[in-house]
Regions:
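Eukaryotic intrinsically disordered, low-complexity regulatory linkers and tails enriched in Ser/Thr/Pro
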Residues: 1-92
């Protein structure tokens, strides 16, 4: 399992909170840069106290019959490395 910081923004604009989420790397279908969140951060309207240079990644997870997606703090390569390193540890 990999710990990521999930952005909670139910209305798609201002971030209401941040929360930890643990993801099984085996269930991640793909990851992609969340350009909308990056644009909001660059405009300074995302979240008080969050550095505007942060990158954001949308994580798409297969939950067995349905797909769930959410945005986490971190660039695509950073998140990919976390997922990859976790898989290597799990496989021994």
């Amino acid at each position: 399992m990999v710990k990521l910081i999930k952005i909670v923004n139910p209305h798609g604009t201002k971030v209401e909170s941040l929360t930890e989420v643990y993801v099984n790397p085996e269930h991640v279908s793909y990851i992609v840069e969340d350009e909308q969140m990056t644009n909001l951060a660059n405009q300074g309207i995302i979240f008080d106290g969050l550095h505007p240079n942060y990158k954001f990644t949308r994580v798409i997870v297969d939950t067995g019959g349905r797909t769930e997606h959410f945005t986490v703090i971190g660039g695509v390569s950073e998140i990919a490395n976390k997922l990859k390193n976790s898989k290597q540890l799990l496989r021994g």
